[in-house]
Amino acid sequence: MWGGAMMFNQIVLQQEALHIIKEFDINYEKYNDNLYVMDSVESTSALLYKAVHAGATIFNCYSVEDVIFKNNKVSGVVVNWTPVLREGMHVDPLNIMAKCVIDGTGHDSEMCRTVARKNGIRLATDTGDVIGERSLDVVSGEEEVVNGTKEIYPGLYVCGMAASAVSGTPRMGPIFGGMLLSGKKVADLIIDALK
């Protein structure tokens, strides 16, 4: 989101996601009957700020290099410093246990690919594997990213463009409402799962 659409400072979202922007107290302007415009930097900053104040921890310069797989369930992530991985240094990673893991890695859907490849399991898709995103269709992509947001394997949830890639739905255009709605949906799914 920080980079907007092709690095423009303004981003667009549709009416269906406006309630999320209001919840985060982000400034916006009406563009037409269904589209709204907001500042990309303010929007991203507000989301990060509110997430941290709600209890989220953001790890700086970390990369997830694997998942923890116990009893046929994704149970956490294996992390290392990004510069260590980039330089190819042999440094043992750390494990972070988690009740739920979200693959929000975008088009690459790295966590889902890793889980399927390394553990011989079937994801909750038509093929049992990462299908791969289809070519761009703005309207369908915005709807399908939300539909594809789900628990894709026990303990592993998928959202955003990773959901599109895993489920084989079209990539989205420069509209951000579907991404926000996908994030809200995965948060609600996990809240329900942890009750």
Where are each of the predicted segments found?
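Residues forming the flavin
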Residues: 1-19, 24-195
